[in-house]
Amino acid sequence: YAPHYYSINVDEINNYSMLVASCNNAAVENITIDLPKARDILDSLESSGDDEEEIRCGLDEVHDLFDINKSGDVETITRYGKSHEEKDIYFTRYADKLLGGADCWGLISAPFGRKANIRKYCNSVLKPFVEDYRSNDVREQHKAKYLEIRKKFLSQYKLVENLRKELGQICALAGSVPVELQEDAPEDLSCEISDVERKRQMLERQLFAEQKELIELEESRPKGLFARRKDTSARDIFIQEKKATISKLNGEITSLNNRISGLQNLQEYQRCISKYSHGQMKMTPVDAVFMERYVSEDDRLSTKAQITNPWFTAQYNREREKLFLYACKLHKEFVISSKCMRHNIINLMIAWNVFDDCGERMKLADREEAMPYMLQSIFLLTPVISTTFASAQTFLGDVKKSGVLGTLIVDEAGQAQPQMAVGAMFRCRKAIIVGDPKQIEPVVTAETDMIKQLLTAEILAGYKDKKISVQAFADYINPYGTYLGKDEEKEWVGCPLVVHRRCIDPMYTISNVLSYDGTMKQQTAAPKEDRARTFILDKSCWI
């Protein structure tokens, strides 16, 4: 094997690796099997007849970027002295081989977990990669491609950042306008601003006159200690009254200044919003109208608010999608042109005993020292990898350091006992916990149940509940959420996703009433008529 292992110079790159873990093997496998499929992405980018021409053009442009048949990126593959060309987006041929010819666009994710899955990944991806990019000449060619795509990526990144900042400024501008002013805005803002400015000027003239009189009163006071004693108290009373009047005028002027500022911000905000009101620039602002819909008891209006994406535009999304593709291509050229990446991959396969004819075996100390960096290389090649918690013990067993990987995504977290996620969380830098506490509870063995009964200390009382899960812990520390249920039975749920896109009636309505206190918003596509007819049988099959 290669005599050295290599780490990535810029450690921040490792922030973007993603490990998806769950108790449910099928759930996490489905995620990583679906992401590389071209059909799902292409379908989501299909324009409809109702779309404006500008929106259709934007969708069609991004659609073609993810269509392998329209890709202008061609790879020359040389094996056994013979060369052939293949169209590519992001290691497309490896993804196709890994997923059994599933018509993929790129190797964005892979299912691990079971040992058979890891071996299949090695045989379908790592071995061909090592063979295809063995030549120094090939790597040099890809270095030139790397520099070329880097320019495109940086240019696109600058464009996306400028759009983000512009949208952020509008968001901040909306926040600077008082809510009551948004709700009761004058019809003619320019006229209203002029009126308020005239009032301010009038008060400023009055203030100037009062200040002048005060100065004259102060200067007309008798000089000397004995002379001042003889002065009547009426003058002092008059001076105090002048000061009170001046203070009141200052307050009124400040109030008018604030109103002018608010009206000017509202005027600028409305000007910006009118710019973002059609085509690819159309945007949903979080304003008084949006909030009225959001909290409305009318299910149709509240659902409309829930399914919107505030402060985003179609143009911004399309440019972000192009940026994502350029980022994938940048990754690809970097990975191919790096000799260190190739060495790390070879060493990883030896550590995993992939080569049956390899007489060398990596020592435990070497494995534990090198494994964090070899896995980081794999995640650079395939950013999203899935595993079950049961298999994570084997997959990550040689990683003894914390924070080696980027983000841990726990799926079906309501089914996972808290201790199951500890090892994976230790090895990742942050975690996203996704689950539903109203669905299947964690499966607790008799031994675990017995241990929980021994937790007699008051501080440990919360850990005794059999239903406690990774999801419950995440919800407990999440300050954003809502309560489901009523009175003693209410349960805190963090960041609830209330829009439902899977079930149809009657299952949806029954579940929504029984488990979710009527908070869910249905957006499931209606089934085709021929399928709907077979959903409810004419008669019971139970009797």
Q: What role is predicted for each listed range?
A:
Residues 199, 206, 362-365, 408-413:
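Short, flexible loop segments at the rims of nucleotide/cofactor-binding pockets, characterized by
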Residues 241-404:
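Conserved helicase NTPase catalytic core signature
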Residues 390-407, 414-543:
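Conserved helicase motor core of SF1/SF2 NTP-dependent helicases
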Residues 1-33, 222, 368-434:
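Secondary-structure-rich domain cores
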Residues 2-221, 234, 238-241, 247-295, ...:
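Extended charged low-complexity segments that act as oligomerization/scaffolding linkers
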Residues 3, 214-222, 354-364, 534-539:
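Active-site-adjacent bridging/hinge elements
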Residues 222-229:
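Charged, low-complexity interaction regions
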Residues 47-56, 295, 299-300, 304-305, ...:
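Accessory, charged alpha-helical segments in nucleic-acid-processing enzymes
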